[in-house]
Amino acid sequence: MEHQLLCCEVETIRRAYPDANLLNDRVLRAMLKAEETCAPSVSYFKCVQKEVLPSMRKIVATWMLEVCEEQKCEEEVFPLAMNYLDRFLSLEPVKKSRLQLLGATCMFVASKMKETIPLTAEKLCIYTDNSIRPEELLQMELLLVNKLKWNLAALTPHDFIEHFLSKMPEAEENKQIIRKHAQTFVALCATDVKFISNPPSMVAAGSVVAAVQGLNLRSPNSFLSYYRLTRFLSRVIKCDPDCLRACQEQIEALLESSLRQAQQNMDPKAAEEEEEEEEEVDLACTPTDVRDVDI
């Protein structure tokens, strides 16, 4: 009996307590200064890639998001993996047959950076229907980290969300709801190539504004009003309020199109009928009414 082991392991992952020192203005200023150092090129499809197209990136990004969701990865893993993918594609031409291998490798490395128990190479190969082997993934990992010069601690929009929420004089229950919705918007933005041109702080601020706008939360001090929040966050990230507003509108448009696409995938017959109706409307009307032209 005296040699029995006492097992105290628990299934839940232990996390550090929130540290207010990590959310002060000095840290945020340093993050805003550093965010551009790990930004991908906005024109790599034109200048670097010969086979890979934006539509292919979208397919791989959607697959990566599904894998991360099914494996219940930390929220930061997917945006960080997409940062690696875009930065690698900014530097190195990739054959379209190797794009899924690159996506799996990016998740593999991002998971090591952010997870307590990272994804294994074998598990990621299973998600590719065993079209790649663990040895290939490990070789690609070496190529990836070398091309990125081992600069793997890239800033993502998730790193900024907590800073913004800490500065908002709101109840914790409201912040929890805003945080969850903003994280969803960040993941959605990572799947769309149009958001590569926006810095992480802008995407994070736009996601918070879009979350508040969509949730329609009531605030006793009216801080959550659209105008006040936009002005406040634009001052925090030192950008023009109109730029932040444009980013937020882009996010809402992306959400709308994604919901529409999901609905069409669930009901293809309804989608066909909708397309037929749109064609009939297009045929029935003229492109521009001359009475609307101001001469």
Swiss-Prot record:
Which keywords has UniProt assigned to this entry? Cell cycle, Cell division, Cyclin, Cytoplasm, Isopeptide bond, Membrane, Nucleus, Phosphoprotein, Repressor, Transcription, Transcription regulation, Ubl conjugation
UniProt KW Isomerase keyword: no
List, for all copies, the residue spans of the domain called Cyclin N-terminal.
Answer: 28-152
Q: Tell me how the protein is altered or processed after translation.
A: Phosphorylation at Thr-286 by MAP kinases is required for ubiquitination and degradation by the DCX(AMBRA1) complex. It also plays an essential role for recognition by the FBXO31 component of SCF (SKP1-cullin-F-box) protein ligase complex following DNA damage.
Record SMART domains: CYCLIN (SM00385), Cyclin_C (SM01332)
**Transmembrane: present as a keyword of the record?**
no
**Pfam families annotated for this entry?**
Cyclin_C, Cyclin_N
Subcellular location(s): the record lists:
Nucleus; Cytoplasm; Nucleus membrane
Q: Which GO terms describe its biological process?
A: cell division; DNA damage response; endoplasmic reticulum unfolded protein response; fat cell differentiation; G1/S transition of mitotic cell cycle; lactation; liver regeneration; mammary gland alveolus development
**PANTHER family in the cross-refs:** CYCLINS
Question: How does the annotation summarize its subunit structure?
Answer: Interacts with either CDK4 or CDK6 protein kinase to form a serine/threonine kinase holoenzyme complex. The cyclin subunit imparts substrate specificity to the complex. Component of the ternary complex CCND1/CDK4/CDKN1B required for nuclear translocation and modulation of CDK4-mediated kinase activity. Interacts directly with CDKN1B. Can form similar complexes with either CDKN1A or CDKN2A. Interacts with UHRF2; the interaction ubiquitinates CCND1 and appears to occur independently of phosphorylation. Interacts with USP2.
**Name of the protein in its database record:** G1/S-specific cyclin-D1
* Gene it is expressed from: CCND1
